[in-house]
UniProtKB/Swiss-Prot annotation:
It comes from Mesorhizobium japonicum (strain LMG 29417 / CECT 9101 / MAFF 303099) (Mesorhizobium loti (strain MAFF 303099)). Residues 1-21 form the signal peptide. The keyword Transport applies. Its main location: periplasm. InterPro entries: Bact_solute-bd_prot1, SBP. This is Probable sugar-binding periplasmic protein. Belongs to the bacterial solute-binding protein 1 family. Keywords: Periplasm, Signal, Sugar transport, Transport. It is found in: Periplasm. PANTHER family: ARABINOSE-BINDING PROTEIN-RELATED (PTHR43649), BINDING PROTEIN COMPONENT OF ABC SUGAR TRANSPORTER-RELATED (PTHR43649:SF28). Transmembrane segments: none annotated. One of its GO terms (cellular component) is periplasmic space. The keyword Transport applies. Pfam families: SBP_bac_1 (PF01547).
């Protein structure tokens, strides 16, 4: 569908560049990094490019899941108004590449050795038909708990190793009058948490079969029903005002001690960093119970568009800066993620960052590095959107039982394929 829309409009507007063109010394970037921690991380890149003489033009679109930004991007591209680059996730990069609107960074990639330094799991989404079309910025993982240490100490809690341990910990917080679980009631947040629940409930092989291979038997299984039951249990620990809450506001609840824990990707750590909080002293980072040894990942990519020749120098400068070792370290320290290349030392990273880097290496080597279905790395966008919709309806009571949820999930994914 995207290919049909964009090919037609790209042909119709192939001469529209001059009317919409950015300044040749300007990097025009569409993104959804609008929270405090995200903006601070992006400033690292802006500063690096400024040193090279390139101005930065933001096209920010708020919304942590990126849905609104992708709607804006589709409109821009359909109008022939290509940005220098856009923040994108996994399969979306491949969709735009298939539509023929992406640039070609292969010469830059060869010159700078990206083939050797960028993990194969990321190259699957940044290389299309042998051409580099995107620059990976980071690797995030979603199966994390972010815990307020003062609240944890107050209730006498310890790291939960199993799902039952986690429920017992949430019960302690509830008994102490603290909101146990901070959640934003948006479909991508709910589905991101469910990614971790499914991995915890079914184990690594089950997660891969269900959410990466889209195996019908796994999606229909009793294990999936149990996963929905476990999700329903977690939702009982959420405050009644969660619906529509932005993810960073849920993180702020933990930072302030209004809530004990948030289940969220490691971009949440950027908010703790922005609030001048220190791991081990102010907050704790644990893997979601039952998922240690596995990593559910996503990666922010800068998809590079087929801009006119006079704008390509700015694009190459952006790509080069993005995958430089110095930027990969400085940016990911602030963002909460880990580098998108394997040869960046962990020297400047805090305890959570060091754990993230070590976990990623272990999972990559052990075959337990899995794409997040909620975050656009498990399956194409139509499937991911169908998944998020079903999970959200279950969380908000529109789907009543786990049996019904499994039936709806199987149907939605089949229809989206």
């Amino acid at each position: 569908m995207l290919r049909k829309l964009l090919i037609g409009t790209a042909l119709a507007t192939s001469f529209a560049f001059s009317a919409h063109a950015a300044d040749v010394k300007e990097v025009q970037m569409l993104h959804w990094w609008t929270s405090g921690g995200e903006a601070a991380a992006l400033n690292v890149l802006k500063g690096d490019l400024a040193k090279e003489g390139f101005a930065w033009k933001d096209v920010p679109v708020a919304g942590g899941g990126g849905d609104a930004a992708m709607t804006a991007l589709k409109a821009m591209v359909a109008a022939g108004n290509y940005p220098t680059a856009s923040q994108m996730l996994g399969y979306t990069v491949l969709d735009y590449a298939a539509a023929g609107v992406m640039g070609d960074l292969t010469e830059t990639a060869k010159k700078e050795g990206w083939d050797k330094s960028v993990p194969a799991a990321l190259q699957k989404f940044s290389v299309y038909e042998g051409k580099w079309v995107a620059a990976p910025v980071n690797v995030h993982s979603v199966n994390w708990l972010w815990i307020n240490k003062a609240v944890m100490d107050k209730i006498g809690g310890t790291e939960p190793k199993t799902f039952d341990d986690f429920v017992a910990l949430l019960d302690k917080a509830k008994a102490a009058g603290v909101i146990p679980l901070a959640l934003g009631g948006q479909n991508w947040q709910e589905a991101t948490m469910f990614d971790s629940v499914v991995l915890s409930t079914g184990g690594p092989e089950f997660y891969k079969k269900a959410f990466n291979d889209l195996d019908d038997a796994s999606l229909k299984s009793d294990t999936m029903k149990k996963s929905f039951d476990n999700l329903a249990k977690l939702v009982t620990y959420v405050d009644p005002n969660f619906s529509g809450r932005d993810w960073n506001l849920a993180t702020a609840m933990v930072i302030k001690g209004d809530a004990l824990v948030q289940v969220m990707g490691d971009w949440a750590k950027g908010e703790f960093h922005a609030a001048k909080k220190t791991p081990g002293t102010d907050f704790l980072c644990y893997r979601f119970p039952g998922t240690d040894g596995s990593v559910i990942y996503n990666s922010d990519m800068f998809g590079m568009f087929n801009v006119p020749d006079d704008r390509k120098a700015a694009q190459v400068a952006l790509a080069t800066a993005t995958l430089s070792k110095s930027f990969q370290s400085a940016f990911n320290v602030v963002k909460g993620s880990v580098p998108a290349r394997t040869d960046v030392p962990d020297t400047d990273f805090d305890a959570c960052g060091k754990k993230g880097i070590a976990d990623l290496k272990k999972a990559n080597e052990g075959g337990t590095l899995f794409g997040s279905l909620a975050q656009g790395y498990g399956a194409p966008p139509a499937v991911a959107n169908a998944y998020k919709d079903v999970v959200s309806k279950f969380v908000h009571g529109q789907i009543k039982t786990s049996d019904e949820a499994v039936t709806e999930l199987v149907k939605a994914i089949d229809d989206a394929k």
